[in-house]
């Protein structure tokens, strides 16, 4: 019986030694981790992300479109030359998470255009009927696999998020097709950074 108790104490003693070494190893590894990695870990403040497929997009002026086609992987639009239009995405929006009101960190778009003569000119963000962010004259064309628009004020969400795209189609003899894949938003609980005066 005494030998068994001695063996148990030894095992406990050995475990305590090893756990102490493990703690020291963890402290050493933490100290050797680059500061950039620590900053990146602290910067993760997205508590909810929501995306909607491009096939859900609405066209404000359908008569200004030469053709449109819903395909499994995107919504294909061909604009009439020399005209502008507005396309709208309604993002599924949680306004509260664990009794805390969410804030908008950034909105994102995924789309392509077939030429520089078909472009996204403006990006407007709405919470219900209130316009909360304006990114005018961005003129995006070509491959935009992940275009981000950060809202530095991080406004609270109350009524539902909408992203409206002002688009344009030039008059050049170029392809005026656009392919909208998806649109989304990152939500946070963090308030905006204080502005130094």
Where are these regions (language model features)?
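N-terminal secretory signal peptides
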Residues: 1-14, 25-28, 35-37
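C-terminal segment of N-terminal export signals and the immediately downstream linker at the start
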Residues: 30-57
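Short beta-strands within extracellular/lumenal beta-sheet-rich domains
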Residues: 78-100
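A short beta-strand element within beta-rich, extracytoplasmic domains
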Residues: 100-114
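Short, surface-exposed beta-strand/strand-loop-strand elements in extracellular ectodomains
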Residues: 117-129
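Extracellular carbohydrate recognition and processing domains
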Residues: 132-154
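Noncatalytic modules at the cell exterior or secretory-pathway interfaces
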Residues: 153-174
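Exposed low-complexity, polar/acidic, P/S/T/G-rich flexible segments that act as propeptides
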Residues: 168-197
